[in-house]
Amino acid sequence: MTGENLIRVDNGGDQTRFPWLGTYQLSRLENQLLLDGLRHFQVFTDGQFPKDVARQSLLAQIAADKSIAQAAPGLNRLIEKVRADLVDGIYVTNLPTEKSITYLLSLTLSSSIGSVFNYGSPNSGRLVMEVASDPSEDQRAELDWRTEGAWVPRDRRTEWIGLLGVENTPGSYTAYAPIKPVEQTLSSHAKAWLYSPSASFHSPHSPASDAMTWSAPRAILSRSPLGHTEIAWPGDAVRAARRDDAIGAGALAELSSEIDQQHVRVSIDAGCFLAFNNLRGVHRQATASDGYCLCYKTYARHSLRALQVKGESGPIFSLAEASASRRDPADFQHPHAAKGKPEYRIHA
């Protein structure tokens, strides 16, 4: 990893290397106009962020429709590119940092991208999740590359993840790599293996010794209904579905190497917002050894229809129902998946 992979808060760095990433820095006037607009909407809730998630969602939708376009037309145009699937991520800086509107700002930005939602467990029914490093615990310098909800069927998995910075120590960052440019550089044999149902994923909530919690043979790479290259990667253990597989280790090593070449890393400081497509790329986080990082995380989808099919209106949905598979073989537990210790992981 080199400095060329870093996009700075001032929008520095070689951004021409990352045409899939849209960036925008609010002017001082746009910052103030957006702050005033969000304050105005919280007047209707006695100046406080509503506790009811349905009211939170409604307030954020109204604020997204009204405040962003009026306060920062350039940012609104960038978000339209997100909604049209023209970019895989956006990095926005110089946003308001006033504590009283931070939750609303987080939801407003994500609501401008899609419908904000969450799963009822293990996130305690909150739309805005606090992601913080714990200085009292030993931490890994970098987490593995991953997609979130890899075990959740595609039409119920989060499409977009939003991260709004609240506090951040220098040296901490989030990295993202879209899979399309990575896939284009892979060798034909690696690509064939990754697109074929050759891997098994282990459930993140089950012990490694439990063979029944390995998925059926599934592909790591796939094509969306619109033809986009997509990836599912749980960040936990993965192994070949067949014990005699001789290609998988090399294919995954090649994939990991190309991700390291194609990714971008950004510092999510206070007033910075990163949103990225969870279906079309992988991400990871790294915290400085003596640092602290706090950001607000949100999930969004273009449509919640598949999540609502069981009768739940949302925006909080049962994780058990969302994870329940219909006919997608990638989500079935498979008693005949190869036994043994995990063989493959993608590392930085």
Where are the language model's segments positioned?
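Active-site environment of non-heme Fe oxygenases that use a 2-His-1-carboxylate facial triad
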Residues: 1-66, 85-90, 124-270, 276, ...
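N-terminal functional module of multi-domain proteins
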Residues: 69-116
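A gly/proline- and charged-residue-enriched helix-loop-helix capping module
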Residues: 99-140
